[in-house]
Protein backbone atom coordinates (compact mmCIF):
# COMPACT_ATOMS: atom_id res chain seq x y z
CA UNK A 1 0.00 0.00 0.00
CA UNK A 2 1.51 3.38 -0.98
CA UNK A 3 2.43 5.74 1.82
CA UNK A 4 0.31 8.91 2.19
CA UNK A 5 3.27 11.18 1.42
CA UNK A 6 3.90 9.30 -1.84
CA UNK A 7 0.25 9.76 -2.78
CA UNK A 8 0.65 13.50 -2.22
CA UNK A 9 3.72 13.64 -4.44
CA UNK A 10 2.09 11.63 -7.23
CA UNK A 11 -0.98 13.87 -7.03
CA UNK A 12 1.26 16.91 -7.40
CA UNK A 13 2.94 15.38 -10.47
CA UNK A 14 -0.48 14.90 -12.07
CA UNK A 15 -1.48 18.43 -11.05
CA UNK A 16 1.69 19.75 -12.69
CA UNK A 17 1.03 17.92 -15.93
CA UNK A 18 -2.57 19.12 -16.08
CA UNK A 19 -2.42 22.50 -14.36
CA UNK A 20 0.89 23.73 -15.76
CA UNK A 21 1.36 22.24 -19.21
CA UNK A 22 -2.26 21.28 -19.89
CA UNK A 23 -3.74 24.70 -19.11
CA UNK A 24 -0.99 26.45 -21.08
CA UNK A 25 -1.58 24.28 -24.16
CA UNK A 26 -5.38 24.52 -23.87
CA UNK A 27 -5.21 28.32 -23.91
CA UNK A 28 -3.05 28.38 -27.03
CA UNK A 29 0.19 29.22 -25.28
CA UNK A 30 2.41 27.31 -27.70
CA UNK A 31 0.87 29.08 -30.70
CA UNK A 32 1.58 32.42 -29.02
CA UNK A 33 5.21 31.41 -28.47
CA UNK A 34 5.51 30.36 -32.11
CA UNK A 35 4.43 33.87 -33.08
CA UNK A 36 7.26 35.32 -30.98
CA UNK A 37 9.78 33.00 -32.63
CA UNK A 38 8.48 34.02 -36.06
CA UNK A 39 9.14 37.67 -35.16
CA UNK A 40 12.59 36.86 -33.73
CA UNK A 41 13.71 33.69 -35.56
CA UNK A 42 17.35 33.85 -34.40
CA UNK A 43 19.12 34.07 -31.05
CA UNK A 44 21.87 36.15 -32.61
CA UNK A 45 24.55 33.85 -31.17
CA UNK A 46 27.60 34.06 -33.47
CA UNK A 47 28.05 30.93 -35.56
CA UNK A 48 24.59 29.50 -34.98
CA UNK A 49 23.35 30.86 -38.29
CA UNK A 50 24.98 27.77 -39.84
CA UNK A 51 22.68 25.58 -37.74
CA UNK A 52 19.23 27.12 -38.26
CA UNK A 53 17.29 24.30 -36.58
CA UNK A 54 19.38 24.53 -33.41
CA UNK A 55 19.20 28.32 -33.48
CA UNK A 56 15.42 28.28 -33.79
CA UNK A 57 15.11 25.63 -31.07
CA UNK A 58 17.12 27.76 -28.64
CA UNK A 59 15.07 30.79 -29.60
CA UNK A 60 11.93 28.84 -28.75
CA UNK A 61 13.33 28.20 -25.27
CA UNK A 62 14.19 31.87 -24.78
CA UNK A 63 10.82 33.00 -26.13
CA UNK A 64 9.04 31.44 -23.16
CA UNK A 65 10.50 33.86 -20.61
CA UNK A 66 10.80 36.98 -22.77
CA UNK A 67 7.13 38.07 -22.50
CA UNK A 68 7.49 38.19 -18.69
CA UNK A 69 11.02 39.56 -18.20
CA UNK A 70 11.46 41.59 -21.40
CA UNK A 71 11.78 45.37 -21.42
CA UNK A 72 9.81 46.00 -24.63
CA UNK A 73 7.02 46.00 -23.71
CA UNK A 74 7.76 46.22 -19.98
CA UNK A 75 5.54 43.93 -17.91
CA UNK A 76 6.13 45.12 -14.34
CA UNK A 77 3.91 42.48 -12.71
CA UNK A 78 5.69 39.71 -14.60
CA UNK A 79 9.19 40.97 -13.80
CA UNK A 80 8.41 41.34 -10.10
CA UNK A 81 6.83 37.90 -9.92
CA UNK A 82 9.77 36.32 -11.72
CA UNK A 83 12.21 38.10 -9.38
CA UNK A 84 10.52 36.77 -6.25
CA UNK A 85 10.13 33.32 -7.83
CA UNK A 86 13.86 33.12 -8.54
CA UNK A 87 14.68 34.46 -5.07
CA UNK A 88 12.59 31.74 -3.44
CA UNK A 89 13.77 28.99 -5.77
CA UNK A 90 17.35 29.82 -4.72
CA UNK A 91 16.77 27.48 -1.75
CA UNK A 92 16.05 24.48 -3.99
CA UNK A 93 19.49 24.07 -5.63
CA UNK A 94 20.96 24.65 -2.16
CA UNK A 95 18.99 21.64 -0.87
CA UNK A 96 19.68 19.49 -3.94
CA UNK A 97 23.43 20.10 -3.91
CA UNK A 98 23.65 19.61 -0.13
CA UNK A 99 21.93 16.24 -0.34
CA UNK A 100 24.10 15.34 -3.34
CA UNK A 101 27.24 15.92 -1.26
CA UNK A 102 26.17 13.72 1.64
CA UNK A 103 24.25 11.00 -0.19
CA UNK A 104 25.49 7.42 -0.32
CA UNK A 105 26.68 6.00 -3.66
CA UNK A 106 23.74 4.96 -5.80
CA UNK A 107 21.28 7.29 -4.08
CA UNK A 108 19.03 9.37 -6.33
CA UNK A 109 20.16 12.43 -4.38
CA UNK A 110 23.64 12.01 -5.92
CA UNK A 111 22.35 13.26 -9.27
CA UNK A 112 21.56 16.89 -8.42
CA UNK A 113 22.75 18.09 -11.84
CA UNK A 114 20.42 15.68 -13.62
CA UNK A 115 17.53 16.74 -11.38
CA UNK A 116 18.32 20.38 -12.13
CA UNK A 117 18.46 19.87 -15.89
CA UNK A 118 15.22 17.89 -15.75
CA UNK A 119 13.67 20.78 -13.82
CA UNK A 120 14.63 23.24 -16.55
CA UNK A 121 13.23 21.03 -19.29
CA UNK A 122 10.05 19.73 -17.64
CA UNK A 123 9.57 22.55 -15.06
CA UNK A 124 10.26 22.34 -11.35
CA UNK A 125 6.57 21.55 -10.74
CA UNK A 126 7.19 18.15 -12.34
CA UNK A 127 10.71 17.61 -10.99
CA UNK A 128 10.17 18.46 -7.31
CA UNK A 129 7.32 16.00 -6.61
CA UNK A 130 9.24 13.27 -8.45
CA UNK A 131 12.35 14.08 -6.41
CA UNK A 132 10.20 13.98 -3.28
CA UNK A 133 8.89 10.50 -4.11
CA UNK A 134 12.39 9.13 -4.70
CA UNK A 135 14.02 10.92 -1.76
CA UNK A 136 11.38 10.14 0.86
CA UNK A 137 11.32 6.42 -0.01
CA UNK A 138 14.97 5.98 1.01
CA UNK A 139 15.38 8.76 3.55
CA UNK A 140 16.20 7.89 7.15
CA UNK A 141 16.85 11.12 9.08
CA UNK A 142 18.65 9.22 11.86
CA UNK A 143 21.18 7.73 9.43
CA UNK A 144 21.98 10.78 7.34
CA UNK A 145 25.66 11.71 7.18
CA UNK A 146 26.95 15.08 8.32
CA UNK A 147 28.24 17.29 5.51
CA UNK A 148 31.97 16.63 5.08
CA UNK A 149 34.58 19.33 5.52
CA UNK A 150 33.87 22.69 3.97
CA UNK A 151 30.97 21.51 1.84
CA UNK A 152 28.72 24.26 3.22
CA UNK A 153 30.90 26.93 1.64
CA UNK A 154 31.20 24.97 -1.60
CA UNK A 155 27.43 24.59 -1.86
CA UNK A 156 26.81 28.27 -1.15
CA UNK A 157 29.43 29.64 -3.55
CA UNK A 158 28.45 27.18 -6.30
CA UNK A 159 24.79 28.18 -6.16
CA UNK A 160 25.57 31.90 -5.89
CA UNK A 161 27.74 31.73 -9.01
CA UNK A 162 26.00 29.00 -10.98
CA UNK A 163 22.40 30.00 -10.21
CA UNK A 164 22.50 33.58 -8.96
CA UNK A 165 24.53 35.16 -11.75
CA UNK A 166 22.48 33.69 -14.66
CA UNK A 167 19.25 34.51 -12.80
CA UNK A 168 20.21 38.19 -12.73
CA UNK A 169 21.07 38.23 -16.44
CA UNK A 170 17.58 37.27 -17.58
CA UNK A 171 16.31 40.69 -16.45
CA UNK A 172 18.80 42.59 -18.63
CA UNK A 173 19.98 44.61 -15.59
CA UNK A 174 22.40 46.72 -17.64
CA UNK A 175 19.91 47.51 -20.46
CA UNK A 176 22.13 45.93 -23.09
CA UNK A 177 19.21 45.16 -25.41
CA UNK A 178 17.19 42.23 -26.69
CA UNK A 179 19.97 39.97 -28.00
CA UNK A 180 22.05 39.99 -24.79
CA UNK A 181 18.87 39.37 -22.82
CA UNK A 182 18.09 36.36 -25.01
CA UNK A 183 21.58 35.06 -24.27
CA UNK A 184 21.00 35.68 -20.56
CA UNK A 185 17.75 33.68 -20.64
CA UNK A 186 19.52 30.82 -22.41
CA UNK A 187 22.39 30.97 -19.91
CA UNK A 188 19.93 30.56 -17.06
CA UNK A 189 18.34 27.57 -18.80
CA UNK A 190 21.51 25.53 -18.22
CA UNK A 191 22.33 26.88 -14.75
CA UNK A 192 22.54 23.35 -13.22
CA UNK A 193 25.64 22.75 -15.33
CA UNK A 194 27.26 25.93 -13.99
CA UNK A 195 26.47 24.88 -10.43
CA UNK A 196 27.99 21.45 -11.05
CA UNK A 197 31.10 22.87 -12.74
CA UNK A 198 31.70 25.43 -9.97
CA UNK A 199 31.23 22.80 -7.26
CA UNK A 200 33.66 20.44 -9.01
CA UNK A 201 36.33 23.13 -9.29
CA UNK A 202 35.92 24.15 -5.66
CA UNK A 203 36.05 20.53 -4.49
CA UNK A 204 39.34 20.01 -6.31
CA UNK A 205 40.73 23.20 -4.79
CA UNK A 206 39.69 22.20 -1.27
CA UNK A 207 40.99 18.65 -1.73
CA UNK A 208 44.43 19.93 -2.73
CA UNK A 209 44.61 21.96 0.50
CA UNK A 210 43.04 19.39 2.81
CA UNK A 211 46.33 18.11 4.18
CA UNK A 212 47.41 21.53 5.41
CA UNK A 213 44.07 22.37 7.02
CA UNK A 214 42.95 19.03 8.46
CA UNK A 215 42.54 20.34 12.00
CA UNK A 216 40.53 23.42 11.15
CA UNK A 217 38.17 21.69 8.75
CA UNK A 218 35.95 20.10 11.40
CA UNK A 219 35.73 23.29 13.45
CA UNK A 220 34.94 25.34 10.36
CA UNK A 221 32.27 22.83 9.32
CA UNK A 222 30.59 22.89 12.73
CA UNK A 223 30.47 26.68 13.00
CA UNK A 224 29.10 27.24 9.48
CA UNK A 225 26.93 24.13 9.02
CA UNK A 226 23.78 26.17 8.31
CA UNK A 227 25.30 29.21 6.62
CA UNK A 228 24.00 28.30 3.17
CA UNK A 229 20.48 27.91 4.55
CA UNK A 230 20.73 31.30 6.27
CA UNK A 231 21.72 32.97 2.99
CA UNK A 232 18.95 31.14 1.12
CA UNK A 233 16.48 32.29 3.77
CA UNK A 234 17.57 35.92 3.51
CA UNK A 235 17.29 35.85 -0.29
CA UNK A 236 13.85 34.22 -0.09
CA UNK A 237 12.51 36.67 2.51
CA UNK A 238 13.81 39.63 0.49
CA UNK A 239 12.08 38.38 -2.65
CA UNK A 240 8.83 37.59 -0.85
CA UNK A 241 8.59 40.93 0.96
CA UNK A 242 9.58 42.95 -2.10
CA UNK A 243 6.78 41.31 -4.08
CA UNK A 244 4.28 42.11 -1.34
CA UNK A 245 5.59 45.68 -1.29
CA UNK A 246 5.18 45.92 -5.06
CA UNK A 247 1.51 44.94 -4.82
CA UNK A 248 0.86 47.34 -1.96
CA UNK A 249 2.45 50.15 -3.97
CA UNK A 250 0.54 49.16 -7.08
CA UNK A 251 -2.79 49.84 -5.38
CA UNK A 252 -1.69 53.36 -4.45
CA UNK A 253 -0.12 54.18 -7.81
CA UNK A 254 -1.40 54.61 -11.33
CA UNK A 255 -3.19 51.84 -13.13
CA UNK A 256 -0.86 49.38 -14.83
CA UNK A 257 -1.03 48.84 -18.58
CA UNK A 258 -2.63 45.57 -19.64
CA UNK A 259 0.02 43.06 -20.76
CA UNK A 260 -0.07 41.03 -23.96
CA UNK A 261 -2.05 37.80 -23.96
CA UNK A 262 1.10 35.69 -24.22
CA UNK A 263 2.57 37.47 -21.18
CA UNK A 264 -0.58 36.69 -19.20
CA UNK A 265 -0.42 33.02 -20.24
CA UNK A 266 3.24 32.68 -19.29
CA UNK A 267 2.65 34.43 -15.96
CA UNK A 268 -0.23 32.07 -15.15
CA UNK A 269 2.00 29.14 -16.12
CA UNK A 270 4.73 30.36 -13.76
CA UNK A 271 2.29 31.00 -10.91
CA UNK A 272 0.87 27.48 -11.05
CA UNK A 273 4.37 26.05 -11.41
CA UNK A 274 5.51 28.07 -8.38
CA UNK A 275 2.69 26.82 -6.13
CA UNK A 276 3.14 23.15 -7.06
CA UNK A 277 6.93 23.36 -6.79
CA UNK A 278 6.90 24.61 -3.22
CA UNK A 279 3.95 22.44 -2.24
CA UNK A 280 6.19 19.50 -3.15
CA UNK A 281 9.35 20.81 -1.46
CA UNK A 282 7.55 21.76 1.75
CA UNK A 283 5.82 18.38 1.77
CA UNK A 284 9.28 16.83 1.63
CA UNK A 285 10.42 19.14 4.45
CA UNK A 286 7.34 18.10 6.47
CA UNK A 287 8.21 14.44 5.92
CA UNK A 288 11.82 14.91 7.04
CA UNK A 289 10.86 16.89 10.15
CA UNK A 290 8.06 14.60 11.30
CA UNK A 291 10.11 11.42 10.74
CA UNK A 292 13.18 12.67 12.58
CA UNK A 293 11.98 11.47 15.98
CA UNK A 294 13.06 14.77 17.52
CA UNK A 295 9.96 16.91 17.08
CA UNK A 296 7.19 16.77 19.68
CA UNK A 297 4.53 18.52 17.60
CA UNK A 298 1.78 16.62 15.86
CA UNK A 299 2.24 16.30 12.07
CA UNK A 300 -0.70 18.58 11.31
CA UNK A 301 0.83 21.31 13.47
CA UNK A 302 4.12 21.03 11.59
CA UNK A 303 2.18 21.38 8.33
CA UNK A 304 0.43 24.44 9.74
CA UNK A 305 3.71 26.10 10.70
CA UNK A 306 5.13 25.44 7.23
CA UNK A 307 2.04 27.00 5.67
CA UNK A 308 2.34 30.06 7.92
CA UNK A 309 5.99 30.33 6.97
CA UNK A 310 5.01 30.34 3.28
CA UNK A 311 2.56 33.18 3.90
CA UNK A 312 4.75 35.40 6.10
CA UNK A 313 8.36 34.83 5.05
CA UNK A 314 7.92 33.04 1.74
CA UNK A 315 8.26 29.39 0.71
CA UNK A 316 11.98 29.60 -0.05
CA UNK A 317 12.86 30.91 3.40
CA UNK A 318 10.53 28.36 4.99
CA UNK A 319 12.20 25.52 3.11
CA UNK A 320 15.64 26.82 4.12
CA UNK A 321 14.59 27.09 7.78
CA UNK A 322 13.18 23.55 7.78
CA UNK A 323 16.33 22.13 6.23
CA UNK A 324 18.53 24.09 8.64
CA UNK A 325 16.61 22.56 11.56
CA UNK A 326 17.04 19.13 9.99
CA UNK A 327 20.77 19.82 9.61
CA UNK A 328 21.02 20.69 13.29
CA UNK A 329 19.32 17.45 14.30
CA UNK A 330 21.58 15.42 12.01
CA UNK A 331 24.64 16.98 13.63
CA UNK A 332 23.27 16.33 17.12
CA UNK A 333 22.53 12.68 16.27
CA UNK A 334 26.06 12.27 14.93
CA UNK A 335 27.61 13.78 18.06
CA UNK A 336 25.48 11.57 20.32
CA UNK A 337 26.51 8.51 18.32
CA UNK A 338 30.18 9.41 18.74
CA UNK A 339 29.74 9.83 22.51
CA UNK A 340 28.14 6.39 22.79
CA UNK A 341 31.12 4.81 21.04
CA UNK A 342 33.66 6.40 23.40
Swiss-Prot record:
Q: What class of enzyme is it?
A: isomerase
Keyword annotations for this protein, in alphabetical order, are: Glycoprotein, Isomerase, Membrane, Transmembrane, Transmembrane helix
Spans traversing the lipid bilayer? 5-25, 81-101, 115-135, 151-171, 182-202, 229-249, 269-289, 305-325
The residues that carry sugar chains are: 224
Its membrane topology is listed as:
Multi-pass membrane protein
Q: Does the keyword Transmembrane helix apply?
A: yes
Is Transmembrane found in the keyword set?
Answer: yes
User: What's a GO cellular component annotated to this UniProt protein?
Assistant: membrane
Annotated EC? 5.4.99.-
**Main function:** Cyclase; part of the gene cluster that mediates the biosynthesis of the tetrahydropyranyl antifungal agent restricticin that acts as an inhibitor of CYP51 and blocks the ergosterol biosynthesis. The highly reducing polyketide synthase resH, the short chain dehydrogenase resG, the cyclase resF, the FAD-dependent monooxygenase resA and the enoylreductase resD are required to generate the first stable intermediate desmethylrestrictinol.
Protein name as annotated: Terpene cyclase resF
Native organism: Aspergillus sclerotiorum
Q: Which gene encodes it?
A: resF
